[in-house]
């Protein structure tokens, strides 16, 4: 990453943008903002979301989203017609099982092998419920769109995992599974020249079946037998995905909120990425409370107390100033509360920019309305890109 990278550089020059962070910090919104801005600058952009809520679909002018990219009507995101004609915007919602099914079909030797795997009960469970499956399929969908979709900007909203690094670890976990001794043993019963090992496997399976039941074991064995011959394709694909994310054309943007836990998770993620030689290029802190001036909390509370005293004095004198003093005092008390929240957030954010290295940093304020349409997405974008007005900086 070059010195002084900006969010404009990311949206104009990168081919892949991965928005990551803990759940509930606005990743889906930020991903949509990047895709819309890319389209407005003439890029063929697609946003991949994992959020099953229909709010993003409604924002983009769609009734729903599916696992297939759907192009959004240009009049929705470019009503003035100012964007270059090359600009296009599409969106899809990741369907983990459908993506896994497609991957199986890609590496199966024939349709018969594909159908045997898809019909297997063990496969139907692991394709949706196995830990890390959603993260890996998000990576797979990203790779598929980049390689075969014709898009020059793919923006991914990563799954809301407790630890954001699960997204990066997913391909490696799959590789470790394929290289696992038990996995290889389960593949052996179909190979006649490994009868000794096969006998050992049978003893192992009989022991396990006493715990989980024979029917479950039969499904597992049938799955691994059907999977035979596909492991190398899956292993190569996982390596290709990791290589793609390590390229300079890929960018990681960490999204956080000012909450202490979210900030710490974001900083930790940035540091771990750096250890893997994958620098974070952007850090976006979402829903920041403005400071509302320079006066400190104590000064504001003192003003509120002074006005409260004036109210009491006016009430004793039966004067007319009691009501106005009461209202103004209440406003100062509210302002002090907001100022205290802003100071607490500033404390949480202290040093986060340094921990993010040379990443571009933006603070998006707590907006007065929810992000539910393209105008609201544009409002968020003003705090990221060159057309932005003066930006809200914590403590300023």
Label each residue range with its predicted role.
Residues 2-18, 25, 30-235, 239:
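Nucleotide-state-sensitive switch-loop elements of NTP-binding domains
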Residues 1-11, 202, 209-225, 235-396:
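C-terminal lobe/tail of nucleotide-utilizing enzymes
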Residues 24, 129-132, 256-259, 263:
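Short, charged/polar micro-motifs that form catalytic or ligand-binding hotspots
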